[in-house]
Amino acid sequence: MTDVSVSKIRNFCIIAHIDHGKSTLADRLLQETGTVQAREMKEQFLDNMELERERGITIKLQAARMNYRAQDGEQYVLNLIDTPGHVDFSYEVSRSLQACEGALLVVDASQGVEAQTLANVYLALENDLEIIPVPNKIDLPGADPERVKREIEEVIGLDCSGAIEASAKSGIGIGEILESIVHLVPPPSDTTGEPLRALIFDSYYDPYRGVIVYFRVIDGTVRKGDRIRLMASGKEYEIDELGVLSPNQVQVEELHAGEVGYIAASIKAVADARVGDTITLARARATEPLPGYVEAKPMVFCGLFPTDSDRYPDLRDALEKLQLSDAALQYEPETSSAMGFGFRCGFLGLLHMEIVQERLEREYNLDLITTAPSVVYQVTTLDGEVLRLDNPSKLPPPQQREKIEEPYVKVEIITPENYVGALMDLCQTRRGIFIDMKYLTQERTTLIYEMPLAEVVTDFFDQMKSRTKGYASMEYSLIGYREGELVRMDILINSEPVDPLATIVHRDKAYYVGKALVEKLKELIPRHQFKIPLQAAIGSRVIASESIPALRKDVLAKCYGGDISRKKKLLQKQAKGKKRMKAIGTVDVPQEAFMAVLKLDREG
């Protein structure tokens, strides 16, 4: 790797909604610049995780360095920093954007601008990036690049006169994209002489070398063997290996301001090298860290329990290993009378939760029971103490608390206009507060609502997709906590409260949710030898109940005729046995029953 002058470096990323062709475009750029040979090429080269390919989404960030000889004959280094497109990973996106000077805005020419594209574009504009619009998939029969350009101009306010119409799949427009990156994206500022400051934009755990940190040098120079300090955690390490990603790792001796690379420094856990942290030298320290570092805070919590309690240590090890590569995942041990030992885990959002569960099941062969997702409530007790609760079963009784506050989010939904009525109805039933409605074009509308996060985390996304035949897209951001009429609803099975089924609900909806839940449990819990009452209760007041009838063994089968008192004796003996069983018998609750809370139709 030869030294490159800063003026020949271009750092850029690709912003796109899921399925608009970002990973395919990245593949084409790697091929066009000769970074990856055709025979090594596989679809979605930068999406390393099997799960990413399967779901067609980018979860962890990747980076690739490409050498490109432009038409002016000069050799340039282009660093592509990949970004996840999904709303749960918006913090990761904001850090990748901080490491760039430019962005390609990829929009599907047949679909138009979507909600998550908008959210990421606003982040890019905040970071003062040069944005190049690229209407993609122009060879599709339904493509209308002119309409998409108009949409970008109207909605985002970007000038689309220099937009490049492309099709990543057929390779149309790839050369023009590379040229425009060279000419439009500004080079990094040359601050090689200043104390080292480098931004960590991703890290992953390698079982042999420890944590591999991906970073962008903002100021100064970093060399192999340097002793570095991470400014947020205050820990120091020695660099064992320094290199660039091309896209496979290639070792180098030093990297200067503006360059992107990776280091291995025997770091034990990803939590020690947090994304967004600043790397500086241990001796010649920078005085100020780079701005914008935020510790990722989990928004959604749920309990994870192994179906076989002997595998609890395996689950603990798996979570420890996952946390090495996913700093946003939090967990703490939890016990439950119904499910034994497990963990209470915190996630960035619903997609993050699903992905972690799938990775645990897939990569570590675990069978898991998950409880209903809940959000973090703020409870003010009568003596003025503020508690943050992520578990409904820990809620203090009503006589000890002054108020409960729940997190609210601002939800932006972009939808074809003929589904507006159905979506407004959905938002209304989810306690949404209507804020605004804008027409992007004649046939597409943005709806803006404020609603409780608890109503969004269950199945709001699925409901939104099914009511709009899959056409709507959404984006949400936290706006703060608000007081609400919230109560804790317990579910009693055979008069015993079952912790994992407890939920915090709004008082107005408690009856509907309780009724739906006990009806669902009645379908899912198998019949036993004794009658099982199912009840939904708020405090000591039962608000909905159902019962599962007993299985009856025919004890009179052996009596052929004969005395009635003989039959009575047998029936009374059976009744006594049932009574004793009911008192001491345990109810076997299947995994599906716990999942029922997730899949409940919450329309009340």
Swiss-Prot record:
It is a peripheral membrane protein. GO terms for cellular component: plasma membrane. It catalyses: GTP + H2O = GDP + phosphate + H(+). Keywords: Cell inner membrane, Cell membrane, GTP-binding, Hydrolase, Membrane, Nucleotide-binding, Protein biosynthesis. The keyword Glycosyltransferase does not apply. Gene3D superfamilies: 3.30.70.240, Elongation factor 4, C-terminal domain, Elongation Factor G (Translational Gtpase), domain 3, P-loop containing nucleotide triphosphate hydrolases, Translation factors. GTP binds at D19, H20, G21, K22, S23, T24, N136, K137, I138, D139. One of its GO terms (molecular function) is GTPase activity. It holds the Pfam family GTP_EFTU. GO terms for biological process: positive regulation of translation; translation. It comes from the Bacteria. Its main location: membrane. It is found in: Cell inner membrane. Its EC number is 3.6.5.n1. Required for accurate and efficient protein synthesis under certain stress conditions. May act as a fidelity factor of the translation reaction, by catalyzing a one-codon backward translocation of tRNAs on improperly translocated ribosomes. Back-translocation proceeds from a post-translocation (POST) complex to a pre-translocation (PRE) complex, thus giving elongation factor G a second chance to translocate the tRNAs correctly. Binds to ribosomes in a GTP-dependent manner. Belongs to the TRAFAC class translation factor GTPase superfamily. Classic translation factor GTPase family. LepA subfamily. NCBIfam families: lepA, small_GTP. This is Elongation factor 4. It comes from Synechococcus sp. (strain ATCC 27144 / PCC 6301 / SAUG 1402/1) (Anacystis nidulans). The gene is lepA.
